[in-house]
Curated annotation (Swiss-Prot):
GO MF annotations, alphabetized: metal ion binding; metalloendopeptidase activity
CDD domains: M35_deuterolysin_like
Pfam families from the UniProt entry: Peptidase_M35
Annotated protein name in UniProt: Neutral protease 2 homolog AFUB_070680
InterPro entries reported for this sequence: Fungal_M35_metalloproteases (IPR050414), Lys_MEP (IPR029463), MetalloPept_cat_dom_sf (IPR024079), Peptidase_M35 (IPR001384)
Cofactor note: Binds 1 zinc ion per subunit.
Signal peptide region: 1-19
Described purpose of this protein according to its UniProt entry: Secreted metalloproteinase that allows assimilation of proteinaceous substrates. Shows high activities on basic nuclear substrates such as histone and protamine. May be involved in virulence.
Amino acid sequence: MKVTILASAILALINGALALPANTPTLDVTLTQVDNTRIKATVKNTGNEKVTFVHLNFFQDAAPVKKVSLFRNATEVEFTGIKRRLLTEGLSDDALTTLAPGATFEDEFDVASTADLTEGGTVTIRTDGFVPITTDRKVSGYIPYQSNELEIEVDAAKAAAVPQAIKLLDRRTKVASCSGSRASALSTALRNAASLANAAASAASSGSSTRFQEYFKTTSSSTRNTVAARFRAVASEASSQSSGKTTYYCTDPYGYCDSNTLAYTLPSSNLIANCDIYYSYLPALTSSCHAQDQATTTLHEFTHAPAVYSPGTDDYAYGYRASTALSASQALLNADTYALFANGTPLLPLSTSTSKCSTLTMVIAVNLNC
């Protein structure tokens, strides 16, 4: 009983440390229709302080990333662009946007380039989530954003004329374009990802409820079973390099890698690609709490692929602080939540191994903003 009380008290301390202060700035997103499926987003800093944030995977990103969610008759329309995992430190200046209090920027994009809207009719558009904020080009926290709900009438013929952002490649073997040191690194990453996912599946289904609550914001048996099932599916997919439900590239077949992108997934094709810095920047397996490595990056990308486990995850938030600020429904579908949970799960039974993210370590990490 004493242990349970202590764990609950520490978890309360963690949640308190992660709570948004009353004066925390937020980003307000106003969506308007420009012409048919072409949309304009106006992003405004509604706070009293200047903020610098990562605009990749957000508005102003030139890549075909998921900027908004589309719904037809309350059912989300499939996204056909890319979802990518980014560095959390050493970010380049061109990945960052700074907004003064009250300042705005605009971004125009065509939602028909990353979704099949050829059916036409009424489509509802909205977005929300968290954007990483930075200090000295390192992610140091997060800022929430939310948009209005925009309803548009789509002209089917005009939508069909919009070029798709990504032209599909021919499917190949599960691990494609791999040779030499990169093939070896990916092989190791897949083995490690499978081990991490299996351990995380056990922890999700029958491990500490306090720890599960920390990441997934609920201890319901149905959520624990769903999380465990996704981890088991990832472990199964990572266990074979000659067959499977995804195609995994050692290199970038579409040209969407840059100096800030570790890897990306094309969910509509269940295709995953590693970028150069996946090999040059990441260790195979980190010993640090909530740090990035090749294994959890691969695990993160597998969760995006709906063929591995449906529905595939989204990128509502990155990093421990933002991911643990999500609601239970968002955490269940947030790729980094799975990577972070797996990162802190011992690979050996708890009797012989302790988590690199012990509760005490996490309290210290939060206080240090790491």
